[in-house]
């Protein structure tokens, strides 16, 4: 995962530390100096801030005190509850925080070797498709000798303050962290993909089936090393930090630190009883203000759970900001959940593995419509197909597909007034099985994302076997920006960008000819096929000038629905297109019949129901069955 970590701004941690040790000085980062520029990008500075090294704040500074825990963190003055919640989630995953905080034992203060300390640290974050190594010095902003931003329970523990400083450096300054998105931080810590879920819109509080499905997915994400966050939407500024009667706080991002089914009852009977309760453990980054409803720390509901089960769950009676809730109550009181999947691409794992395709792209503007790549969403039909297009394949009868589009992070450009995200999204279309060139007309929409001005947009969808085109867009045309497209499938999807609008002219075109006609053939299905005891296991093959497209086998039916399409760029207009129907057998497939399609561009009857014919008979003789075919032809190769 970290075989190729890129030094951020070309600062090499090892070389810088070596140089400081040689010169016996503490590192001072010239790219993130101890000045107001590193604190704010606008507005008037508050109280006089003094930058201090940990040794100037306490006697015995440490990266970690008694290990790392989600209890370590407390939010400071900046409105980065979202980042602190993500850190709380990170702290509960040793395999993840050790990647964000690399070689932590070497970075830790060593009281026995005080001269080895160089005042320099480094941290890894996933940034727009690659891992970056961010170097910082250890000077931290304080007021009255107190850290003003993220800090630990222990006065001499500094891991969270240093991680926050490195993240602020990526963002441009501390103020740029104000009002961010937990989903972004979770992705930056893991390289995974975040899926936001609107609990209110999905009506999870009242729909038990949907709620149970969501809990199972959260259980799977948590058990496989993912990170989860929950929050209550603050609709107005007055709502921010508003505490509800139940003890929860609006506008706060709560870290989910455990997901489990809790066994109710006592003794041996409880072990064999099937009654279990879906429960979630959460933590408030403020470190206090807990839930006071059912299953809160001191509630009588805990009497239903055995002492051993409570100990296993780590139930404590203290106002430490961590508490349990039933998942039903979570769905009733919270409005949003963010699941960050840590995508498993290792083939050595016992869990499901994914194949990832990762492509960089951009929305760009050009006077030539063929070169313009900033067409806006489908509302703008005249320019929509000018957007970037990416083709991928689903190679199983049905597969779960995860798609994420991320625009280049904008926080570091806030100082120049360019820090706002574009509203982005994407549509997915099922296309012909042999498409190699860009789409120019609408086809069946297989799925679509929401459009939102967040850094990332995610979609999970189940799709049948076939070929698909993703069209990522900005909501309005005329906007420019870079993006990263990530597509996860069970088997390799051969995802790639479609760059050409039509077959290219080559040196062979004058000798072999160039296409004069484009024809799209859509075989919908067949009816009345030759009887067999179990029904036909049929498939179709569409042939044209040496190119062919084959459908999947439709088992046990004489009225199959093939729903297969092919696109053909034709040079020999007098040569018909052939559609053959076959019956799949163990030893040898059986020919059931065929039809020939002239597919002239002036044929206005686009939908045809044709009788199957024998292929060898000179006289046209009908065989059992008909095939339904939709045909579209044009002399403009950019018509389809």
UniProtKB/Swiss-Prot annotation:
Gene Ontology BP annotations: proteolysis; signal transduction
Residues forming the catalytic site: 81, 252, 284
Keyword Hydrolase found: yes
Keywords for this protein: Disease variant, Hydrolase, Protease, Thiol protease
Distribution of this protein across tissues and organs: Expressed in many tissues. Strong expression in the photoreceptor cells of the retina, with a punctate pattern of labeling over the nuclei and inner segments with less expression along the other segments and outer plexiform layer.
Region (Domain III): 344-496
Family statement: Belongs to the peptidase C2 family.
Function: Calcium-regulated non-lysosomal thiol-protease.
Disorder named in the UniProt entry: Vitreoretinopathy, neovascular inflammatory: An autoimmune condition of the eye that sequentially mimics uveitis, retinitis pigmentosa, and proliferative diabetic retinopathy as it progresses to complete blindness. Patients present during the second or third decade of life with posterior uveitis and reduction of the electroretinogram b-wave. They become more symptomatic when cataracts, cystoid macular edema, and disk edema diminish visual acuity during the second stage.
Protein name: Calpain-5
Lineage of source species: Eukaryota, Metazoa, Chordata, Craniata, Vertebrata
Gene label: CAPN5
């Amino acid at each position: 995962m970290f075989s190729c970590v890129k030094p951020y701004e070309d600062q090499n941690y090892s070389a810088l530390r070596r140089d400081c040790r040689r010169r016996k000085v503490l590192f001072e980062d010239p790219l993130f100096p101890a000045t107001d520029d590193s604190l704010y990008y606008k507005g008037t500075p508050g109280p006089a801030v003094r930058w201090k090294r940990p040794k100037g704040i306490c006697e015995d500074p440490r990266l970690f005190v008694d290990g790392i825990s989600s209890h370590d963190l407390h939010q400071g003055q900046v409105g980065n509850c979202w980042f602190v919640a993500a850190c709380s989630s990170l702290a509960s995953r040793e395999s993840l925080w050790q990647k964000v905080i690399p070689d932590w034992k070497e970075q830790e203060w060593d009281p026995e070797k005080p001269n080895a300390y160089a005042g320099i640290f480094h941290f890894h974050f996933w940034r727009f498709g690659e891992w970056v190594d961010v170097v910082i010095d250890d000077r931290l902003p304080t007021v009255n000798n107190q850290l003003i931003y993220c800090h630990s329970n222990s006065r001499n523990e500094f891991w969270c303050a240093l991680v926050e400083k490195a993240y602020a450096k990526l963002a441009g300054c501390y103020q740029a962290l104000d009002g961010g998105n937990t989903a972004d931080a979770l992705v930056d810590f893991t390289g995974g993909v975040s899926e936001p879920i609107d609990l209110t819109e999905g009506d999870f509080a009242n729909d038990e089936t949907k709620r149970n499905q969501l809990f199972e997915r959260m259980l799977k994400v948590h058990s496989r090393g993912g990170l989860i966050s929950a929050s209550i939407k603050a609709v107005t500024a007055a709502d921010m930090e508003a505490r509800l009667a139940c003890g929860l706080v609006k506008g706060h991002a709560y870290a989910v630190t455990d997901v489990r089914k809790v066994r109710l009852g006592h003794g041996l009977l409880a072990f064999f009883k099937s009654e279990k309760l879906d429960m979630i453990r959460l933590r408030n980054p403020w470190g206090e203000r807990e839930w006071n409803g059912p299953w809160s720390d001191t509630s009588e509901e805990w009497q239903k759970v055995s002492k051993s089960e409570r100990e296993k769950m780590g139930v404590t009676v203290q106002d430490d900001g961590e508490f349990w809730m039933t998942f039903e109550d979570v769905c009733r009181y919270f409005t949003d959940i963010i699941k960050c999947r840590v995508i498993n691409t290792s083939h050595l794992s016992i869990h499901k593995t994914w194949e990832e395709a990762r492509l960089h792209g951009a929305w760009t503007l050009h006077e030539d419509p063929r070169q313009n790549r900033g067409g806006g969403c489908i509302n703008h039909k005249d320019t929509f197909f000018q957007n970037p297009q990416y083709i991928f394949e689903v190679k199983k009868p049905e597969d779960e597909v995860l798609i994420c589009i991320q625009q280049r992070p904008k926080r570091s450009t806030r100082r120049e007034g360019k820090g706002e995200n574009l509203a982005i999204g994407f549509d997915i279309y099922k296309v012909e099985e042999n498409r190699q060139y860009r789409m120019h007309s609408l086809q069946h929409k297989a799925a679509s994302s929401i459009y939102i001005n967040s850094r990332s947009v995610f979609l999970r969808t189940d799709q049948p076997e076939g070929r698909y085109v993703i069209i990522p867009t900005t909501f309005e045309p005329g906007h420019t920006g870079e993006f990263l497209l990530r597509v996860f499938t069970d088997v390799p999807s051969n995802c790639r960008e479609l760059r050409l609008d039509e077959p290219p002219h080559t040196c062979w075109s004058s000798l072999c000819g160039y296409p004069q006609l484009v024809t799209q053939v859509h075989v919908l299905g067949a009816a009345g096929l030759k009887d067999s005891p179990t029904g036909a296991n049929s498939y179709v093959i569409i042939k044209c000038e040496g190119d062919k497209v084959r459908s999947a086998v439709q088992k046990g039916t004489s009225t199959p629905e093939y729903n297969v399409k092919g696109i053909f760029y034709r040079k020999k207009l007098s040569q018909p297109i052939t559609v053959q129907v076959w019956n799949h057998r163990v030893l040898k497939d059986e020919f059931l019949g065929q039809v020939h399609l002239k597919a002239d561009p002036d044929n206005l009857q686009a939908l045809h129901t044709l009788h199957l014919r024998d292929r060898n008979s000179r006289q046209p003789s009908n065989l059992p069955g008909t095939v339904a075919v939709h045909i579209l032809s044009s002399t403009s190769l950019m018509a389809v």
